[in-house]
């Protein structure tokens, strides 16, 4: 019986699709046939869902599309925060179309006008298939009156939309920090961003809703600015306290050093006094000995005087030795 070769063979390849890098995991012979970049406007970075875009984290932990981070970085690097009327003044249409084409190819050209960059950020939000605030019940948003109401209602957003809103709010807060230069306060920024955060078919309803969205954005932006200022003041107070503590510690160390020096000087003085007492004692002993010697000398001297006084004459021999007196006999 002849044994034939295997039949009905299948090769299964597990691959991952990435919008920016095509299929990952394909055999190398198939890679040249896979486009590496978005090939047409149908795969543009504008007007598509965030689920089909490459995401990354910003400095505050918001997971947002990379295109927004790139536009934001370029806007900041080119001094867009200081540009007067940023996000209010529109850029040149021809330049915006050119930049759009380059962004679809994954390229960010150099020398883009800051107003064009700001306009593209607004356009990205405006052209989303679903607005950032669309998941919220419009009736509930319209009923908000206080800052606490707005904070509560935005907590109902899904994670993706919440990250996008938080990113936009912090962007506006960054702009407000240079309000004295760019003339853009919280109201002006909320006014230009509000129409791009939701989509409604009825123009009149959309207009009324945009007014409430403007209040929401203004409230959240001002809250963020206040929190930053409070955090900054806390840091400043902490640094000031640390500086004061450092000065106090330094003063204490200097006082301790001065006290130690004084103690050392006192110890030296005491040592000198003790040393002086020792010298005095020694001199006193020497004086006692001298007095004793002198007394002995005086004593021996007085005896000698008496002895000498009792002799009639001093008689010396040839050797100069004192001779005893010669007693004369009585007649």
Curated annotation (Swiss-Prot):
Compositional bias ranges of the Acidic residues kind: 252-277
GO CC aspect terms: plasma membrane
Pfam families (alphabetical): PBD (PF00786), RhoGAP (PF00620)
Basic and acidic residues: compositionally biased ranges: 227-251
PROSITE patterns reported in the protein's UniProt record: CRIB (PS50108), RHOGAP (PS50238)
Tissue spec: Expressed in differentiating xylem cells.
Keyword Cytoplasm: no
Keyword match Transcription: no
Name the record gives this protein: Rho GTPase-activating protein 5
Classification via Gene3D superfamilies: CRIB domain, Rho GTPase activation protein
InterPro entries associated with the record: CRIB_dom, CRIB_dom_sf, Rho_GTPase_activation_prot, RhoGAP_dom, RopGAP1-5
Species the sequence originates in: Arabidopsis thaliana (Mouse-ear cress)
GO molecular function: GTPase activator activity
Function comment: Acts as a GTPase activator for the Rac-type GTPase by converting it to an inactive GDP-bound state.
Keywords: Cell membrane, GTPase activation, Membrane
Domain CRIB as annotated: residue spans: 3-16
Chain spans, region Disordered: 227-331
Membrane association type: Peripheral membrane protein
CDD domains: CRIB (cd00132), RhoGAP (cd00159)
């Amino acid at each position: 019986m002849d044994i034939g070769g295997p039949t009905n063979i299948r090769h299964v390849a597990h691959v991952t699709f990435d919008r920016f890098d095509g299929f990952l995991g394909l055999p190398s012979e198939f890679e040249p046939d896979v486009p590496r970049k978005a090939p047409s406007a149908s795969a543009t970075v504008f007007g598509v869902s965030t689920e089909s875009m490459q995401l990354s984290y910003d400095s505050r932990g918001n997971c947002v599309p990379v295109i927004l981070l790139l536009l934001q970085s370029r806007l900041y690097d080119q001094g867009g925060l200081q540009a007067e009327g940023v996000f209010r003044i529109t850029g040149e249409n021809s330049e915006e179309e050119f930049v759009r084409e380059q962004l679809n190819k994954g390229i960010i050209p150099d020398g883009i006008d800051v107003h064009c960059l700001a306009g593209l950020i607004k356009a990205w939000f405006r052209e989303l298939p679903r607005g950032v605030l669309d998941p919220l019940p419009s009736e509930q948003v319209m009923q908000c009156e206080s800052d606490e109401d707005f904070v509560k209602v935005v907590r109902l957003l899904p994670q993706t939309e919440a990250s996008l809103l938080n990113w936009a709010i912090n962007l506006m807060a960054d702009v407000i920090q240079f309000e004295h230069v760019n003339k853009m306060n919280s109201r002006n920024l909320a006014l230009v961003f509000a129409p791009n955060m939701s989509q409604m078919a009825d123009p009149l309803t959309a207009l009324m809703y945009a007014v409430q969205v403007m209040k929401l954005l203004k409230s959240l932006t001002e809250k963020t600015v206040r929190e930053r200022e409070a955090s900054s003041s806390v840091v400043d107070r902490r640094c000031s306290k640390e500086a004061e503590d450092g000065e106090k510690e330094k003063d204490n160390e200097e006082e301790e050093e001065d006290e130690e020096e004084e103690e050392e000087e006192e110890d030296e003085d005491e040592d000198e006094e003790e040393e002086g007492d020792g010298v005095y004692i020694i001199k006193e002993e020497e004086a006692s000995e001298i007095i004793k010697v002198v007394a002995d000398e005086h004593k021996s001297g007085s005896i000698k005087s008496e002895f000498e006084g009792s002799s009639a004459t001093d008689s010396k021999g040839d050797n100069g030795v004192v001779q005893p007196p010669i007693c004369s006999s009585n007649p």
